[in-house]
Amino acid sequence: MAGTVIVPWYATGFRADAFELALNEVAPVALRYGADSYAVYRANDDRYRFQQFASFAEHLDWERYWEGPEMVDFRVRHSSWYQVPVLYGWWEQTAAGALVSGLPPLANGHGNGHGVTAGESA
């Protein structure tokens, strides 16, 4: 079953900037283990707080990434750079949306409906 893993990290004192660099280096490795996408976010209101996201088609692929040599090495090398325990969760997406820029407008801009091809006005 597809899902997204969210890993909440909290860096220890004065290590947040270095932790960010290290986490940004290891996060893309998830793609080699079958992830469709990954992301790392850093909180603006608490610069020690990070969220790591990785979307997988199968939970087993996540486990292979988390227990793989790259992530084990990351956790060992940087064990004093973040607080434990690290309690990640497997999440199922229930809704999503996005605005896509660069697409031509559906209407001609004259208000007469030409070019409208879908929706209630069609």
What are these regions (language model features)?
Residues D17-F19, F50, W62-R64, A98-L99:
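Short acidic, gly/pro-rich beta-turn/loop elements at beta-sheet edges
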Residues T12, Y65, P69, V84, ...:
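Enriched - but not universal
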Residues G3-Y10, A39-P69:
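Short, well-ordered beta-strand segments in beta-rich or mixed alpha/beta enzyme
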Residues M1-D17, F56-W62, H78-V84, Y88:
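Long, low-complexity, intrinsically disordered polar/charged segments
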Residues A2, D36-Y48, F74-A122:
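Glycine-rich beta-strand-turn "strand-cap" elements at beta-sheet edges
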Residues R15-Y38, E70-F74:
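Short amphipathic alpha-helical segments
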